[in-house]
Amino acid sequence: MQRLITYLLLFSSSMLHAYELEVNGVYIGILGTRIAYVTSRGEETSEPCYSGDVVVPEQVTYNGRVYNVTSVADNAFAGCDELTSVHLPPTVKAISPCAFIGCTSLRSINVPQSMNVITNAAFTACTSLQQISLPKRQELVDSLTFYCCSSLTSFVLPHRIRTIRCTAMQHLSSLTDLYCFASEPPLAELGSFSLADQKKCTLHVPRETLGMYQERQVWRDFYNIVPLEDEEYEKEGYQRGDVNGDGMIDAKDLELLRLIIVNLPDDSAVRWAADINEDGVINAKDYVLLAKLI
């Protein structure tokens, strides 16, 4: 395990990006005429360039032009062992490979719900990371993404997760609760999790597909599998009535509910939001109640 982490750190140091400007201690690269990205100081120094609490700007101005900061580049924070927290603006849509690898003091980072992509080894060996939330649109947990994040005690897989790659969540030695909101058990490759972690971690899954998780390869190796409770949906921002998951309850949800009554979707999170009166059945009663709420 340590050899792998050392290799990745050495490899990442050879892939540093140059920067064009510095804004409040954050190094910014420029691509084309509209895109800016967070990077490091490049190859001019081997010293970690970030420490403490870092706030990434939403926009920067360069040569008289305004750029949105849209991504965190490969290895941007790699090996910054005194970095403690990072705040990302909603303009950031992607975290590139090895972006935070080896940030051993990183305790927290906000991941905007607008985020589209978190790539492989992004948080490898962030051994102090205590909490991180994936965006609800996330469909893949890539290889080594959270490898050896040994301080995580709980983790949430949103309802659109479809695939978990090998080594994605290995060596999470403090993990006690894993919440998976996907109705269909995601394709979890062999080695996605460490078997030792699975034996002491409780897996929380949608009530109606609990049996599927108990039978599927990899998932069945969790020692304790239990159904998700209502308060756990609410804690993660799911709302009764917000059927389309956009954070608002309006006419769009009412129209979608009308369609759902005719053709019930497989997505348990959508069904949970559509069950307005909480009786376990989605029908005209829910439609009438939602219409009154709007």
Regions found by a protein language model. Name each.
Residues 1-4:
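Positively charged n-region of N-terminal signal peptides that target proteins for export
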Residues 8-18:
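Hydrophobic h-region of N-terminal signal peptides that target proteins for export
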Residues 16-24, 29, 222, 228-247:
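Intrinsically disordered, low-complexity repeat and linker tracts
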Residues 18-46:
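Short beta-strand/loop segment at the start of cytosolic alpha/beta domains
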Residues 49-71, 81-94, 103-117, 126-140, ...:
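Structural signature of tandem-repeat unit edges
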Residues 73-76, 96-99, 119-124, 142-145, ...:
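Consensus positions within tandem repeat domains that build extended binding/scaffold surfaces
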Residues 190-195, 211-222:
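Short, aromatic/basic amphipathic alpha-helical patches
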Residues 232-294:
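Cellulosome-associated attachment modules in secreted, modular CAZymes
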